[in-house]
C-alpha cells in the first residue's frame, strides 16, 4: 500500500479500483461481505491512521454502490467501473443501498451537525433528483428540513442546548421527539423506489472540533436508530479517543466510550 495525494474524484477512484494502487481491493471485497450480512440498523468504524486512504476507501464503496443500484441515476457502466476484477463481484448483489457521504470536518463550523446531515441526505446525489418544491416528494423533504431547522433555529422552538440546561425540559423532550420523527420521515422520502437501506458515510470525524464530533456521535446514535439505516464512520479511532478524553478529562476511557457508537470495527491495513 502507498499513499495517494490526489483528490478522490470519480476518475481517480475508478483508476485505483483498476490498478489497486492502494492495495485496498481485498478490503473492499471483505467490506461487501460485511454489508451483505447486516440485518437491520447497524454502525461500524472503518479505522486507520491519518493519510492511509480511509476517505478513498469509503468513497470507492459509495461509488460502487451507486453504480450497482439500477434505480439511481448514477447507475451505468458497471463493467467500466469494476473492469475485470472478479474480487469485487460481490458488490453486484448489493443493489439496494443508497449511499450518502458526509464530511464532518467540512461542516464543523455549525453549532449542531443534524441540519447539515439532514441536508446531505436530502440533497446529495440521486437522493435529491426529485427535490423540487412543486412535487410531493419535494414538499415532504422541505417540510422535514423545516421541522429539523425549527428545533435548532432562533425563536419559535427552544434549542436543545437551552432546553437541556433546565430551561424547559418538557419542550426538550418534545423537540427530541420531533427530531426523531423528522429523521424517520426523511428516510421515508429518500428510500422509496430507490433503495431499501440508507448507507450514511461519516468521514473525517476525528479532525473536527471536539464538541462537534461528540454531537455527531450522540445525535446519530439517538436519532438514526432505524432498521433501514447503516452508519459507517471513517475514523482514526485512536485520535478520536484522545478527542473524547480531552473533552471529559484525564483518566476518562475514550476507547470504552466510543464503543457505545459502533457494532463493529474494521481496521484497514
Task: Describe the residue ranges of each PLM region.
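Conserved strand-to-helix beginnings and helix N-cap segments that scaffold or border functional pockets
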Residues: 111-115, 210-217
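The catalytic "switch" region of P-loop NTPases
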Residues: 1-28, 49, 64, 189-198, ...
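Switch/connector loops and helix/strand junctions flanking conserved nucleotide-binding motifs
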Residues: 54, 109-113, 239-245
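Walker B catalytic acidic pair
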Residues: 203-204
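Glycine-rich, histidine-containing beta strand-loop boundary motifs that form or position
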Residues: 48, 103, 132-133, 233-235
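P-loop NTPase nucleotide-binding core
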Residues: 58, 63-189
Amino acid at each position: 500500500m502507498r499513499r495517494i495525494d490526489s483528490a478522490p474524484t470519480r476518475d481517480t477512484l475508478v483508476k485505483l479500483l483498476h490498478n489497486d494502487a492502494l492495495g485496498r481491493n481485498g478490503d473492499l471485497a471483505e467490506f461487501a461481505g460485511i454489508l451483505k450480512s447486516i440485518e437491520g440498523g447497524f454502525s461500524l468504524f472503518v479505522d486507520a491512521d491519518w493519510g492511509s486512504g480511509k476517505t478513498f476507501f469509503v468513497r470507492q464503496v459509495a461509488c460502487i454502490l451507486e453504480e450497482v443500484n439500477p434505480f439511481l441515476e448514477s447507475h451505468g457502466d458497471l463493467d467500466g467501473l469494476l473492469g475485470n476484477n472478479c474480487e469485487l463481484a460481490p458488490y453486484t448483489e448489493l443493489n439496494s443501498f443508497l449511499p450518502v457521504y458526509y464530511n464532518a470536518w467540512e461542516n464543523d463550523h455549525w453549532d449542531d451537525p443534524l441540519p447539515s446531515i439532514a441536508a446531505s441526505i436530502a440533497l446529495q446525489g440521486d437522493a435529491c433528483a426529485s427535490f423540487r418544491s412543486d412535487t410531493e416528494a419535494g414538499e415532504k423533504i422541505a417540510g422535514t428540513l423545516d421541522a429539523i431547522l425549527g428545533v435548532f433555529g432562533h425563536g419559535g422552538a427552544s434549542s436543545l442546548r437551552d432546553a437541556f440546561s433546565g430551561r424547559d425540559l418538557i419542550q426538550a423532550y418534545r423537540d427530541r421527539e420531533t427530531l426523531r420523527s423528522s429523521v424517520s420521515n426523511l428516510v421515508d422520502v429518500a428510500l422509496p423506489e430507490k433503495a431499501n437501506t440508507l448507507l450514511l458515510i461519516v468521514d473525517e470525524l476525528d479532525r473536527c472540533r471536539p464538541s462537534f464530533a461528540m454531537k455527531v456521535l450522540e445525535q446519530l446514535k439517538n436519532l438514526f436508530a432505524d432498521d433501514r439505516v447503516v452508519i459507517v464512520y471513517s475514523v482514526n479511532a485512536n485520535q478520536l479517543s484522545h478527542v473524547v478524553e480531552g473533552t471529559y478529562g484525564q483518566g476518562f476511557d475514550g476507547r470504552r466510550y466510543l464503543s457505545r457508537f459502533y457494532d463493529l470495527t474494521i481496521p484497514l491495513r
